[in-house]
Amino acid sequence: MTLSAEQLATFDAEGYTVLPRCFSDAEVTLLRHEAETVLKHNRPEVWREKSGAPRTAFAIHRFSDAFSLLARHPRLIEPVRQLFVEDVYVHQFKLNAKAAFEGDVWQWHQDFGAWQRDDGMPQPRAVNIAVFLDEVMPINGPLLLIPKSHRARNIDGTTAYPLWTLDKETVTRLVLDAEGEDGIGVVAPTGKPGTVLLFHGNLVHAAPPNITPYPRKVVYLTLNTVANRITKSTRAEWLAHQDFTPIVPVADDALAEYARTRRVAAA
């Protein structure tokens, strides 16, 4: 799968693009089931909310066959190769649960801030890919993006939170700069399960809490170019992978076929 000229232009201008329903119902059902399984694991890679509800599970492609296939799926790999015209590797793989009633806030930040300061990533030549496992709606803690903020490059952040977060004045300025004819400088991409969102590593984003009965599980795959590999990671390997082997995509039907074999085995 490749991006259209319009999608490429949108990504360049706005810092993100949305690809509706990239994965089938059968593929999403498999991934949602696998997500429930991995979120029950008691291991360092699985972070929890204060309540004990799952918050984020990292490196799940290392202990789930289904997510291993997703990490190498051509519908995710090829668009990023197209953007950079280079081989890519997995820098980070995670599942954000945003559990119903429990999913807490993620403050305003740029991901490249952490990649550069904590991992020694030279340039923002990495892309985040979000795969919606549940329907993402305006009400259940969707990701909030500030369009065009990737053009601000690397903005100084603070360490007042487990991310390099941005202060209110900076966020306000970026939002005002991004305001369009509607007078709104923040967007919340929504979509059905199986939708994919690509966004630039310097795009400023956040997420409000989820206080609804509707969960909002999203898989995030960060792909970095091999030539831009990290040089001095201070974080655990499951937070910033140090296997820089170029990804070899699986067959396009690999995930669907795995879902089919699982259904047959369970019958």
Question: Residue spans of the language-model regions?
Answer:
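Non-heme Fe(II)/2-oxoglutarate
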Residues: 41-45, 52, 193-198, 202-267
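Extracellular structured ligand-interaction cores
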Residues: 92, 124-130, 140, 186, ...
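Short edge-strand/loop segments of extracellular domains
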Residues: 98-100, 146-153, 222-228
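A short secondary-structure junction signal
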Residues: 104-108, 117-119, 139-145, 154-158, ...
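Short, surface-exposed loop/helix-turn segments at secondary-structure junctions
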Residues: 109-113, 169-183, 215, 234-239
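Short, conserved beta-strand element in jelly-roll/cupin
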Residues: 118-138, 190-191, 222-225
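Double-stranded beta-helix
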Residues: 139-204
